[in-house]
Design a protein with these regions (language model features):
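Structural motif
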Residues: 8, 30, 117-118
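Flexible, glycine- and charge-enriched loops at secondary-structure boundaries
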Residues: 6, 74, 78, 212
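Sec-dependent N-terminal signal peptides
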Residues: 4-14
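Long, contiguous interaction/recruitment modules in multidomain scaffold/adaptor proteins
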Residues: 80-245
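A structural "domain/chain start" motif
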Residues: 16-97, 233-340
Length: 340
């Protein structure tokens, strides 16, 4: 029985669907290929954050309670802008796509206008701004029953009121990109998020903490969108190989080769079975493996041939999907042309 296990395993691998990764370059949403020498201005802080501390009626206890922040709103706005700047520079620097002029140096040049940046060789300037910070709040009370034992051992029931400060923070962060030669805006995008936090308030010490981390978390959440906006990146499209149905015994060797990691042998076998037997799964799989080797032209031509001759729905779906990946890859490669 032991000697049969490897055989059974190979049969299982041959019958199952295997995922093949197809590498491609996902283009950035804004084509920045002509603006890789990028000056980054300091983030403009939001002006106007105001927090309503409000008086809260304390049901059944002290008549009024005032809740006080323990931080300066001006400092919070400045710190948020500073953190946004460090995150932005970190994201762009890590991409390796740009030659960057740091905010401090950009500020010195941009004060004389875009021409000064252009004359210094910078093709575009990124103007980041925190365009909205809002912190709305309310206090809600929760009443719960308490149970205590009196001196005589009898249970005493009571009511206790607890207070919860509910804070909802909203942050909007806007990036503008300007061509330093023409002064025209290349692109603009705003990122917006909101978060809610509940804090239990002690009526004897009704204060709440600095909201700095609250806004920092939202800024970190923008990094992925900023990267997609400005940086072409390598990604992987995972495609499932087509199962051996209708089953062709000769195709088993191709699936086995793939299961053992020999993609080139699997590709050659699948292609041969399509050319000689017109076996649709083999034709589809040969196309996907060609794409995984970076040959999108051969892959698409083969899938077009399969669809044209057989009208197979699976092949048509693969053709549509792979055409989209190939198109994105072409744009992405244009954006990264000349990049080391």
């Amino acid at each position: 029985m032991r000697r049969l296990l490897p055989v059974l395993l190979l049969l299982a691998l041959s019958a199952c669907s295997t995922t093949v990764g197809i590498d491609y370059t996902q283009p950035s949403e804004v084509d920045m290929s002509s603006y890789r020498k990028l000056a980054v201005a300091p983030v403009k802080a939001y002006e106007g954050l105001w927090i309503n501390t409000g008086w809260i009626q304390s049901v059944g206890e002290s008549p009024l309670m005032n809740v006080y922040p323990t931080f300066s709103t001006d400092k919070l706005c400045r710190d948020t802008a500073s953190y946004a700047g460090s995150q932005l520079m970190g994201t762009l620097s890590a991409s390796g796509y740009y030659e960057l002029l740091p905010p401090a140096e950009t500020a010195g040049l941009i004060s004389s206008g875009y021409e000064a940046l252009r004359d210094a060789g910078w093709q575009a300037v990124l103007l980041p701004e925190v365009t909205l910070m809002d912190l709305s709040e309310k206090v809600r009370s929760v009443r719960r029953m308490t149970r205590e034992r009196g001196a005589d051992g009898r249970e005493i029931l009571g009511m206790e009121t607890e207070y919860i400060l509910v804070q909802t923070a909203v942050l909007e962060y806007t990036l503008r990109i300007v061509d330093t030669s023409s002064g025209e805006e290349i692109a603009s995008r705003s990122f917006r998020d909101s978060r809610t936090k509940d804090t239990w308030i002690d009526p004897t010490h009704p204060v709440y903490d600095d909201m700095d981390q609250f806004f920092r978390n939202m800024l970190r959440g923008f990094n992925k969108g900023i990267n997609a906006l400005l940086v072409p990146v390598r990604q992987v499209y995972d495609a499932k190989l087509v199962k051996n149905k209708p089953k062709l015994k000769a195709a088993g060797a191709a699936y086995d080769a793939l299961a053992s990691g020999d993609r080139l042998t699997a590709l050659a076998l699948f292609r041969q079975l399509w050319d000689e037997e017109r076996h649709v799964p083999s034709g589809c799989n040969a196309a996907l493996l060609s794409a995984s080797e970076g040959d999108f032209v051969t892959a698409l031509e083969l899938l077009e041939e399969v669809v044209r001759e057989t009208g197979d729905g699976t092949a048509r779906d693969l053709l549509n999907d792979l055409s989209g990946v190939s198109a994105r890859n072409s744009v992405g490669e244009q954006q990264t042309a000349g990049l080391d």
